[in-house]
Each structure stands twice: as structure tokens, then as C-alpha cells.
């Protein structure tokens, strides 16, 4: 057995991989073993599995097909490996990634240490503010499903040059998919959803990065989302024509020519962000794209549906989780006005929930009086009927169930949290 594979299978590396998989949680694979059961499974089976891997006898199980609806229609096909295979894949990634980092492009930002969507957006803003305001937005058609496996393994060999490890990686590519209709072979692609897939996608697309660098082009790439910034429309047309041809000819990947297009910053959507020119600062800045904002609002609307069961406290806990996650991702962008609007609408919807849960006029009168409303006004308001939105926008209800009251109940203010996180991005 090779030294590299021994390093992958070492106790320290596999323990770290096990902890990472447990921390990420996630659903089980085709064997129905869950993350919670993983420790017992490893204690019972790991010695045998390790020996099988050493002798090239281990056979990974097929991934479980899960289809996630896309916002614009269609589905994203994910392949969920078994939890044991996730641990092994994570062990491979932990050892091979440091070997890949020195050869990866400076302008590649996906699934790499100390890099993120935010760093990709920051770099794109630098290009825009240097005058590179024509954008070639490349769309690779079903990238993870269409990666040529032989070409990919050739690139892996160039980096690690280790037959035992390459054999194990190829087995994961060939493991197949289990769908409701039965087993399907995988002769193309690397299943999106496995721990290995992000690293393998970067290895494949590093060839594109090198070609773009050799041409002196300014680009940012996050996984298979790649944009190229140039100074003129003529340059953009030339780059789009030659690069799409190169991708199909040299990498054997499919380019979706209906979605690959030339655009300007104002119309660009990249990694969920939109872009605008700040007239005062006279520079390009970013903010959440309108589609991203709409999706966020819809999610909050779902969580504040008055027909959904659960206490106000439970609802607020779920709302806070969504607010923090969304704002942490988009905190680099400018969005004070949007945050203030969402705050106001969110508080109104929570007032409706509270009003409905009080149910009867006597309970509503009691609730308003407890929050400081005078007896007569509380009684008058409480007997207004069940026109929820109309009642909860009345001044006395707004003042009673105020921002401060909802904050004491635990609700995070979108605007306050955004201001806090955005300030950190400017440091």
C-alpha cells in the first residue's frame, strides 16, 4: 500500500474526518445508517473496511439521489453518499487538498481555505472599479453531471501520482446512483453532494483558470460559477466565443449557450449578489440581488404564516436562524433600506400571530392592558373583530407590541444585526 493512502487511512486523519462529518450532520445514504449511528458503525466495521481499501477490494455504495427544486424551475440533482463513505471521502480531501493548493489559481474562491463567496465578490468589485465593466457570464451545463471522468482522473494523477489513491477515487466516481426506479451507472460526472466533489471540481476547472490566466484575463470563479471582466463589448464577444469553444474542445464540458451571455454590472447576478454604481462615492458596490431578497421575504412569510402551529417563541427562534444566516452571507452588501422594510413587515406579521393567539376579545383586552394600553382603548380595540391586519396596524397595537417588546421576546432586528455585521466587513 502506498504512503499516501496510509496517510489517508491513519487514525488521526480518519478521526478528524469523522468529527467533520458528524459536525456537518446531514441525511443518511442508501444503507440508512445515520450520523448518530456512525460511531457504533465504525467501531464494528472500520478494521475490515480499512483492509479492503488497502487491498483495493473496497466497493463504495451508490449515492442516494435527491432532487432539489430550483427557484427558476427544474431540479438540482444531489447524490448523498452513505455516512461511512462520507468519512472516507473527507479523509481523502484532508490529505489531497494541501497538495492541490499550491497549483490552484489565485482567482478561484470556492471550497478553499480562507476563501469564500465574499472574497470572490470583493475581487469582482475591484475589476469593476478598475474599468472592466463588460462581463462574460459563463454557464456550464449540468457541470457536476457532465465531468469527463477519464480527463478528471488524468488531472488527479498529475497532482498525486499514486495508483492506490487514484483507484479509490475512481471507485467513488463509478459508484452509481440509487433512484426510486433503481440503480443507475455513473459513466460521467462527480455526484454533487459528496465530500470529494468540490475538490474534484476545482481540479477540473483549474485548467480553465490556467487558460484564462495565460490570456491575461481578469476573472473570478466560485466552483462552476465563473465571470470574466473586460473593458469593451468587442473584447467580451471575442472572449465569449473563444473561451466557450476552448472549454468544450479541451475540457470536454458542455457550455449552456442559452445562459452564457455578455452583460453589464447593473444586470449581473453573481453568487446571489447584484451590483450598482454609488453616485456619491463614484464606485461600484454590491447588494443582494432582487431575486435573493424576494426569496428571503418568502421564507420569512412562510415562517410567519398565522395558520402554522407553534408558539410565538418557537416561531421567533426559527425566524432568527434564517435572519442571521441570510445577513451573514450578504453582510458585505448595501441594504439598510431593505432591512428596515423587512423589519417593519415582519413585526406586523408577528403582531397578527399574537393577536390571533389571544383569540377572544377578553384575552385581547387583557393582553393590551398588560402591555400598557389604557382600559377603555384596550377594550375598544379588542372588540374590533378578526380583521387581523387592520387591527394590528392600529397605533395602540403597534405601540403595545412594539419593537422593544418583540426584542424582549427574542426577535432579532434585521437592520440592527445587518449594521453590526456590515461594520465588521468594512474593517
Q: Language-model segments: which ranges?
A:
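Non-catalytic, peripheral interaction segments enriched in hydrophobic/basic residues
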Residues: 315-361, 365-369
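Short acidic (Asp/Glu) and glycine-rich catalytic loops that position anionic groups and cofactors
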Residues: 24-31, 100-104, 133-134, 148-150, ...
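A conserved non-catalytic segment of reverse transcriptases
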Residues: 174, 250-317, 321-324
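Electropositive, glycine- and tryptophan-enriched low-complexity nucleic-acid-binding patches
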Residues: 89-109
Amino acid at each position: 500500500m502506498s504512503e499516501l493512502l496510509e496517510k489517508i487511512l491513519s487514525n488521526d486523519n480518519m478521526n478528524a474526518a469523522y468529527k467533520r462529518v458528524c459536525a456537518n450532520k446531514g441525511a443518511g445514504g442508501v444503507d440508512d445508517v445515520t450520523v448518530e449511528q456512525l460511531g457504533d458503525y465504525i467501531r464494528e466495521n472500520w478494521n475490515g473496511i480499512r483492509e479492503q481499501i488497502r487491498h483495493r477490494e473496497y466497493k463504495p455504495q451508490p449515492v442516494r439521489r435527491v432532487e432539489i427544486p430550483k427557484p427558476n424551475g427544474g431540479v438540482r440533482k444531489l447524490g448523498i453518499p452513505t455516512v461511512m463513505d462520507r468519512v472516507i471521502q473527507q479523509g481523502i480531501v484532508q490529505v489531497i487538498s494541501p497538495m492541490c493548493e499550491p497549483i490552484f489559481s489565485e482567482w478561484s474562491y470556492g471550497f478553499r481555505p480562507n476563501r469564500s463567496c465574499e472574497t470572490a465578490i470583493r475581487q469582482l468589485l475591484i475589476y469593476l472599479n478598475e474599468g472592466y465593466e463588460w462581463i462574460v457570464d459563463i454557464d456550464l451545463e449540468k457541470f457536476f453531471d457532465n465531468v469527463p471522468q477519464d480527463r478528471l482522473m488524468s488531472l488527479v494523477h498529475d497532482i498525486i501520482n499514486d495508483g492506490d489513491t487514484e483507484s479509490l477515487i475512481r471507485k467513488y466516481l463509478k459508484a452509481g446512483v440509487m433512484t426510486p426506479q433503481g440503480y443507475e451507472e455513473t459513466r460521467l460526472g462527480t455526484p454533487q453532494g459528496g465530500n470529494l466533489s468540490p475538490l474534484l471540481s476545482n481540479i477540473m476547472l483549474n485548467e480553465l483558470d490556467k487558460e484564462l490566466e495565460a490570456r491575461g484575463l481578469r476573472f473570478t470563479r466560485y466552483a462552476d460559477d465563473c465571470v470574466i471582466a473586460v473593458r469593451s463589448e468587442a473584447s467580451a464577444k471575442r472572449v465569449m466565443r473563444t473561451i466557450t469553444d476552448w472549454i468544450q474542445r479541451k475540457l470536454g464540458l458542455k457550455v449552456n449557450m442559452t445562459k452564457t451571455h455578455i452583460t453589464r454590472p447593473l444586470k449581473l447576478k453573481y453568487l446571489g449578489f447584484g451590483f450598482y454604481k454609488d453616485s456619491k462615492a463614484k464606485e461600484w458596490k454590491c447588494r443582494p440581488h432582487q431575486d435573493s431578497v424576494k426569496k428571503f421575504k418568502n421564507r420569512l412569510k412562510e415562517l410567519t404564516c398565522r395558520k402554522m402551529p407553534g408558539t410565538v417563541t418557537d416561531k421567533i427562534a426559527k425566524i432568527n436562524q434564517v435572519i442571521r444566516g441570510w445577513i451573514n452571507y450578504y453582510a458585505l452588501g448595501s441594504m439598510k433600506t431593505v432591512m428596515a422594510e423587512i423589519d417593519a413587515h415582519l413585526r406586523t406579521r408577528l403582531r397578527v400571530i399574537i393577536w390571533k393567539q389571544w383569540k377572544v376579545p377578553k384575552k385581547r383586552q387583557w393582553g393590551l392592558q398588560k402591555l400598557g394600553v389604557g382600559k377603555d382603548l384596550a377594550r375598544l380595540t379588542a372588540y374590533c373583530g378578526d380583521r387581523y391586519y387592520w387591527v394590528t396596524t392600529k397605533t395602540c397595537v403597534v405601540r403595545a407590541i412594539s419593537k422593544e417588546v418583540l426584542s424582549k421576546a427574542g426577535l432579532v432586528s434585521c437592520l440592527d444585526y445587518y449594521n453590526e455585521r456590515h461594520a465588521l466587513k468594512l474593517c
